[in-house]
Amino acid sequence: MDVFRFLANRHPAVLKFGWRLGMWGLGFSFWGRFLAENPANQEGFWPAVAKRWPLKGGDRNMPKGPIRLHLWHTRGALDGIIMGLWAQRTGRPWRIWTHPLVYRTLGAPDWAFSAPIDAESWKAHYTWAQSVQGILIIFHAQPPRPRAVEQGPWHALAGQIALRDARGVEIGTFSAWKSLRWLAKHPAGLPIVLEWKVLGQDGSYQV
């Protein structure tokens, strides 16, 4: 760290040259081209991911009306990408909410916590989902606990994601870093089969 601080204070031109050289080298990798050509937005990000890793299986007749989909988050960034692909394919508006404990379980620093936990944020999510009949995907740090509550217009589903690749090899639990590394190493076009193990559909799951 002292070396970097010394270079930044005494030789900023060297540091700038090193940064440009690193970015130039990154451009030759898949992730470099991916980030350069497809900024992480709804219009460019998900179609690009879906083209490289087409999602197979897991189709389910989703009920009409707003849906709360409670999931046990186990694979770091990979679960979020897979559920984003699935939700995008349904053709319905969707949002992903991640519990702060998930970040802590994955070893992320406190500043990485981006999940809204106050009542007003929850109310905004619920109002949005009800107005557009959307899907609210909620990632838990542990299996959701059933609670007998009044659901109103909501359809509540709970489950855990089980993944297998096209060869039938099960994809286990990864850290966020290993998930991205796994994605980068898989050849383009290798389909991912989504097996959605539903834990319950009795309307008794609530955050």
Please state what every model-predicted region is:
Residues E37-Q42, W46-V207:
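Soluble catalytic domains of membrane acyltransferases
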Residues D2-P54, A108:
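A transmembrane-helix-recognition feature enriched in membrane-embedded lipid enzymes
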